[in-house]
């Protein structure tokens, strides 16, 4: 596998200071413009009003043992850990970027069960310890590109999904892989209340073609910055597919099911004209309401210092993954 294409130092996200454009979609789903314009403090008050204000802080992640394959290491300064953990989309905990960090401490991640089922010869069930002990862990420094046209560079820790799927032995009927987030409305206020969760249908679901899932880049991620994932980043296990937009990176996974037919995916169900099944990073295919030709790397000085640079096809991983889509019209299959 080829080594990562190097980024400039200015490419690394340093601060969370820009606006959510998907709010227009949420308004179409019935969430009021007034609610969407509320500042974070007001969102916090609303969460308290719906759920009470005694939310525990997220526990500190434990240190993990992992290797650092040379192909995925470089000397770039990384997005600061507090920005990666403090600036998230995880609508189960609220719409504001700061809501997941503020509210995800209520998520219980141990014990945990992850089931692999469907078109497999050997269905599997993994517990919390299996996620960090059954497979050798490695750190991979990946670009992360949000569909909202911002990006980060993050040192994820995990294991290739293909290793897990190989244990389950997909049958010849398996063509797709369906993923599902935990459904726990008593712990996730956005699942309990349509207002808080943006009107999406829960549990959150995602999917990949089997060949995408089996690609060496596709990572079952259990840690970041040397420690177990914090709840707001998708603990205890999430998906990272670095050549796709971030909403494909489903968090807090409890089910992986291999299927014959293409599975439904949450954002495609919510707005099929805006969020496709493939969701490959592509500067030549714009979102209906904004350009994807460039992306924002957010500097420490605030929104006026945000630097914009060209978006890379497949988020810079074209050499590794373009062959998966040979002959596929990427405009029609966005």
Curated annotation (Swiss-Prot):
Key word Signal present: yes
Alphabetical UniProt keywords: Metal-binding, Molybdenum, Oxidoreductase, Periplasm, Signal
This protein's record includes keyword Transmembrane: no
Residues the entry annotates as binding Mo-molybdopterin: 88, 91-92, 146, 181, 233, 238, 249-251
Catalytic activity: L-methionyl-[protein] + a quinone + H2O = L-methionyl-(S)-S-oxide-[protein] + a quinol; L-methionyl-[protein] + a quinone + H2O = L-methionyl-(R)-S-oxide-[protein] + a quinol
Cellular component terms (Gene Ontology): periplasmic space
GO molecular function: metal ion binding; molybdopterin cofactor binding; oxidoreductase activity, acting on a sulfur group of donors, quinone or similar compound as acceptor
Documented EC number(s): 1.8.5.-
Main location: periplasm
Cofactor(s) listed: Mo-molybdopterin
Protein name per the record: Protein-methionine-sulfoxide reductase catalytic subunit MsrP
Lineage start: Bacteria, Pseudomonadati, Pseudomonadota, Gammaproteobacteria, Enterobacterales
Gene: msrP
